[in-house]
A protein has these predicted regions:
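Cytoplasmic membrane-interface "Motif A"-like loop-to-helix N-cap segments
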Residues: 53-64
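C-terminal ends and interior cores of transmembrane alpha-helices
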Residues: 66-79
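A membrane-interface helix-boundary motif in multi-pass transporters
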Residues: 139-157
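Helix-to-loop junctions at the C-terminal end of transmembrane segments
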Residues: 44-55, 141-142
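Hydrophobic core of transmembrane alpha-helices in multi-pass small-molecule transporters
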Residues: 2, 83-97
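Extracytoplasmic gate region of multi-pass secondary transporters
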Residues: 1-47, 99, 133
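Multi-pass alpha-helical transporter architecture, strongest
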Residues: 153-179
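Intracellular juxtamembrane helix-capping segments at the cytosolic ends
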Residues: 97-110
Length: 179
């Protein structure tokens, strides 16, 4: 969930400067963030629906890998309004789509009695990722005059997150029963 936080904070914090540096009109980042917000709703509902029918770990792997593809598309193709729209739609669809399957895995493995506490603990990793995505994005920009290393790191994190979810055993842990 750390990677989710990294992606979200990096994009939300630095997309205006990134797009300005690429020479896109001033209104383009606002449009991209609005598209992210709109398509986030559809993506989150869709991932929640899919998480009730398919492997949650595979859904999470797909989401993170697709985020990497979306970032690759966005940073390696020529900057344009069209490519910005495609990024806003695709990244928006994937934005918080990690939440339902992540929460589902926690509930499935550990049960629902303490799901609030356990998800709170999981969410701390999201917030650490958010801090680092926003902060290090700025550090990379100050050191290099661009966001290249922040984007490359985001792609690497996408691959890592896509792979790290695959070994998860989606099975409830055995609980000891009191005598």
């Amino acid at each position: 969930f750390f990677v989710c936080g990294w992606h979200i904070a990096l994009v939300a914090t630095h997309i205006p400067t990134y797009m300005a540096d690429k020479g896109l009109p001033d209104w383009t980042p606002a449009m991209v963030l609005a598209l992210i917000g709109v398509f986030n709703m559809a993506g989150t509902i869709t991932s929640g629906y899919l998480a009730t029918r398919y492997s949650k770990k595979k859904i999470l792997s797909a989401i993170y890998l697709l985020r990497g593809v979306s970032i690759i598309y966005f940073i390696f193709l020529p900057p344009s309004i069209f490519n910005s729209v495609v990024f806003g739609v695709t990244f928006g669809f994937l934005w918080l789509s990690t939440v339902p399957p992540t929460n589902g895995i926690v509930a499935h493995i550990f049960g629902t009695k303490y799901v609030g506490l356990l998800y709170g603990i999981v969410f701390v990793s999201h917030q650490i990722g958010s801090f680092l995505g926003a902060y290090l994005g700025g550090v990379f920009y100050e050191l290099n005059g661009n966001f290249d290393y922040a984007w490359y790191g985001s792609i690497a994190l996408s691959i890592f997150a896509g792979l790290i979810h695959l070994p998860i055993v989606e099975k409830a842990i055995e609980r000891t029963q009191p005598a």
